[in-house]
Amino acid sequence: IIETPIFYENCTAKEILGIHAQYMGKNITELDIIRALRMVGLKNTTKKVKDFSLGMRQRLGLARAFLTKPKLLILDEPINGLDPIGIQEIRNLLLSLSKEHGITILISSHILSEISQIADKIGFIKNGEIVEQVSMKEIRRENIDLEEYFMSHFLN
């Protein structure tokens, strides 16, 4: 999912997911669409997407991705532009997708304090290459947070 998901602005959330299901060539029912919308906590699904907040758009993007029951979700800056409540809601949703639905989630983000609350494993990329992978357990054993770890290992 890209940082700012793109949708047909004059469609409702249900219509967006229906179009996506047809495009993907999947046998997805109206019930599947309703489940996906419920799972991401998207309410007021009769509203046009043009009237959605950024948080609602992020949720719709996640519902669209989840509709095909992926094993892997790749997210680019999923909390950018969200208020603290929206950030917490997306964080809880991502944790739920991972734990309850067994989905692996790969997140690209510059907000290390937030990532440290979601991730099990961190990969650091420099010049397009993964230069280090470390678990959050290992970082916590050093009694530092993810930002301190990054600063001490990559800003010499």
Predicted regions and their residues:
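Helical segment within the ABC ATPase nucleotide-binding domain
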Residues: 88-100
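Conserved ABC ATPase "signature" region
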Residues: 18, 22, 28-44
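Conserved catalytic motifs of ABC-family nucleotide-binding domains
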Residues: 69
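Hydrophobic anchor residue at the start of the ABC signature
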Residues: 62
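Conserved ABC ATPase signature
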Residues: 48-55
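Catalytic Walker B motif of ABC-type/P-loop ATPase nucleotide-binding domains
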Residues: 73-77
